[in-house]
């Protein structure tokens, strides 16, 4: 038996962050879409349980319970109880690490979908979402890879507004941007504007209208502190903003990945090719945003 699942990159079109609560958690409001680029997770029957990471960034991935795929398997087996057969889980890691793309959460979501298929096909979506939500703030949002609005600590999910097809270029300068460090810099540097969501407009029919709405009413509150910690993120944003194909340039999540929204696939392809030529030391991917893929 071999099962495979796609683990798409998550992109925050906006991320509004409030001040920390008494427990130190920050309330957020975010519109999350998913890309048609990402990692892959596969499951195979085995005599003993094992986990391995392959792919371009596989060597940077922990293979113990520091990895969300391993923790996802442990959590689901604990939820099911009783004896369960062993599996070999393989992660093909194509996304950069600590990149603001929800890669770990998306990998865990893919693993949970595969494990449910193999171990407990009758387990409800709600039960699987509860397991995913226990793995981290993005866990439930990244389980299905479908566009969502996230509130609270990221666990309050609602369907995203209807949007036209979005063509984008993802760029990462191949420097890590640890979430905890960025939030600490955010707390130290700014007076929070608050996590209130923007006015959600229906009937956005073109990418130009989407970009005008994003630019006029939304932001990523973690972008400035992330750039302060790692100026190379700012270099990415400046380069993208200067290119003619870019309608909007912004950072995703806590970085370091940034995205440029483009009018169409041809424009995104041209921008990606030019960035790759200018900065061969950066990770660059043309993609579509939406989901599920």
Curated annotation (Swiss-Prot):
Disulfide topology: none
InterPro entries attached to this UniProt entry: GHMP_kinase_C_dom (IPR013750), GHMP_kinase_C_sf (IPR036554), GHMP_kinase_N_dom (IPR006204), IspE (IPR004424), Ribosomal_Su5_D2-typ_SF (IPR020568), Ribsml_uS5_D2-typ_fold_subgr (IPR014721)
This protein's record includes keyword ATP-binding: yes
Catalytic activity: 4-CDP-2-C-methyl-D-erythritol + ATP = 4-CDP-2-C-methyl-D-erythritol 2-phosphate + ADP + H(+)
Keyword tags: ATP-binding, Isoprene biosynthesis, Kinase, Nucleotide-binding, Transferase
Any Pfam family matching the protein: GHMP_kinases_C
Gene3D superfamilies: 3.30.230.10, GHMP kinase, C-terminal domain (3.30.70.890)
GO term, biological process aspect, one: terpenoid biosynthetic process
Catalytic center residues: 10, 138
Binding site for ATP: 96-106
Nucleotide-binding listed as a keyword: yes
UniProt cross-references to SUPFAM superfamilies, sorted A to Z: GHMP Kinase, C-terminal domain, Ribosomal protein S5 domain 2-like
Enzyme Commission code: 2.7.1.148
Pathway: Isoprenoid biosynthesis; isopentenyl diphosphate biosynthesis via DXP pathway; isopentenyl diphosphate from 1-deoxy-D-xylulose 5-phosphate: step 3/6
Entry's Gene Ontology molecular function annotations: 4-(cytidine 5'-diphospho)-2-C-methyl-D-erythritol kinase activity; ATP binding
Family under the similarity heading: Belongs to the GHMP kinase family. IspE subfamily.
NCBIfam families reported in the protein's UniProt record: PRK14608.1 (NF011202)
Cited function: Catalyzes the phosphorylation of the position 2 hydroxy group of 4-diphosphocytidyl-2C-methyl-D-erythritol.
Protein name: 4-diphosphocytidyl-2-C-methyl-D-erythritol kinase
């Amino acid at each position: 038996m071999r099962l495979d699942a796609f683990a798409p990159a998550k992109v925050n079109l906006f991320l509004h962050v409030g001040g920390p609560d008494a427990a130190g958690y920050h309330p957020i409001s975010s519109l999350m879409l998913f890309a048609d680029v990402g990692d892959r997770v596969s499951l195979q029957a085995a005599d003993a349980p094992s986990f391995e990471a392959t792919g371009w960034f596989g060597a940077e991935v922990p293979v113990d319970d520091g990895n969300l795929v391993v923790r996802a398997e442990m959590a689901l087996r604990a939820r099911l109880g009783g004896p369960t057969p062993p599996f070999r889980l393989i992660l093909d890691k194509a996304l950069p690490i600590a990149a603001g793309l929800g890669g770990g959460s998306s990998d865990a979501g893919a693993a949970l979908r595969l494990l449910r298929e193999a171990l407990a096909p009758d387990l409800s979506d709600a039960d699987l979402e509860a397991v995913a939500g226990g793995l981290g703030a993005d866990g439930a949002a990244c389980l299905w890879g479908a566009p969502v609005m996230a509130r609270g600590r990221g666990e309050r999910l609602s369907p995203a507004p209807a949007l036209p097809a979005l063509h984008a270029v993802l760029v990462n300068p191949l420097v890590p941007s640890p979430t905890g460090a960025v939030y600490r810099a955010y707390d130290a540097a700014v007076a929070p504007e608050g996590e209130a969501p923007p006015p959600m407009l229906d009937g956005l029919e073109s990418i130009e209208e989407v970009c005008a709405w994003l630019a006029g009413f939304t932001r990523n509150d973690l972008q400035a502190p992330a750039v302060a910690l790692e100026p190379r993120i700012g270099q990415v944003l400046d380069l993208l903003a200067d290119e003619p194909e870019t309608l909007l340039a912004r950072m995703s999540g806590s970085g370091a990945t940034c995205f440029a929204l483009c009018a169409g696939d041809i424009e995104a392809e041209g921008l990606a090719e030019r960035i790759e030529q200018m900065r061969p030391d950066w990770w660059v991917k043309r993609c579509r945003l939406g989901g599920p893929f």
